[in-house]
């Protein structure tokens, strides 16, 4: 129903599978605990030319355009930027629930925690969920109850791989002497950063915290033999908060030393 789907936000636009825990029988209380974890990786990277091949092809382009060749003095790296930004990600999902029932009352309480570490370094996502439902049987044919689903989500500060497949391999990742990430050569540094600047130094520059809650209260009345009347009041609440800042970044330029 919409109140259960609401906590998934846009992720639930194409539908979700909701697993309903079996309710306890009258006089029973059930406790269910389950957890899972896994790993994820990028199985196939985009094949890129190495530094020597890049220098040859770039200078060939300049010659064909009638321009002088680029002086690669000081640019001695041979970096595969995809190797630098990617990592093996980690996923875990954990849930605990308690359900119980008597002749006049049934309840369900569940909580969950999900955490995902992305395939790009410093990319992570987490979600805490809470589900509560209660139903009271006032008479043999009249029941009242409520349901609530809530979630606190810390979305990932997502990064793209575009820079990693565009950046020249001739730049080294880091200059140990000055303790700085290396900038890209003149023909690229105005267009993009060293990919690790975006992945590492700009990590967590966007901080978001989202809350979602939905619920309903209802009353059900069975009358005659095959008829039921149900009245329901529903609510849906969402709060999305985000902050972004631009850090001051220093980088090392191999072509401007001294």
Per-region residue spans from a language model:
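Periplasmic N-terminal accessory/gating domains of Gram-negative outer-membrane beta-barrel systems
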Residues: 1-5, 15, 39, 78-89
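A beta-strand signature from Gram-negative outer-membrane beta-barrel systems
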Residues: 1-32, 91-93, 106, 112-117
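Short, surface-exposed loop/turn motifs at beta-strand boundaries within globular domains
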Residues: 12, 89-91, 127, 210-212
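Membrane-embedded beta-strands of outer-membrane beta-barrel proteins
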Residues: 17, 96, 130-132, 215-217
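Surface-exposed loop/interface segments of Gram-negative outer-membrane beta-barrel transport/assembly proteins
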Residues: 25-78, 118-123, 129, 133-214, ...
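Outer-membrane beta-barrel channels and translocator barrels
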Residues: 26, 91, 102-103, 139, ...
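Outer-membrane beta-barrel initiation region
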Residues: 45-47, 84-88, 98-102
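An active-site-proximal structural segment forming one wall of the substrate-binding cleft
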Residues: 219, 227
């Amino acid at each position: 129903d919409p109140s259960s789907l609401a906590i998934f936000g846009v992720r639930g636009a194409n539908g979700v599978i909701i697993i309903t825990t079996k309710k306890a029988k009258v006089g029973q209380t059930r406790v269910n605990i389950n957890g899972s974890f896994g790993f994820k990786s990028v199985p196939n990277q985009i094949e890129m030319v190495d530094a020597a091949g890049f220098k040859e092809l770039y200078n060939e382009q300049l010659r064909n355009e009638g321009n002088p060749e680029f002086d690669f003095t000081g640019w001695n790296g041979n970096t595969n930027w995809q190797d630098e930004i990617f990592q093996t990600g980690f996923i875990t999902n954990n849930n605990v629930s308690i359900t119980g029932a008597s002749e006049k009352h049934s309840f369900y309480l569940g909580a969950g925690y999900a955490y995902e570490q992305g395939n790009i370094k410093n990319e992570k996502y987490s979600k805490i969920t809470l589900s509560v439902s209660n139903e009271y049987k006032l008479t043999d044919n009249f029941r009242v109850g409520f349901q609530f689903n809530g979630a606190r989500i810390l979305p990932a500060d997502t990064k793209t791989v575009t820079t990693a497949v565009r950046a020249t391999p001739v730049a080294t990742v880091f200059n140990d002497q000055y303790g700085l990430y290396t900038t890209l050569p003149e023909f690229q540094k105005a267009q993009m950063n060293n990919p690790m600047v975006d992945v590492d130094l700009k990590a967590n520059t966007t901080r978001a915290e989202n809350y979602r809650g939905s619920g309903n209260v209802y009353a059900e009345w069975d009358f005659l033999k095959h008829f039921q009347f149900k009245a329901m009041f529903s609510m849906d609440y969402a709060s999305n908060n985000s902050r972004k800042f631009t850090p001051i970044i220093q980088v090392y330029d191999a072509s401007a030393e001294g």
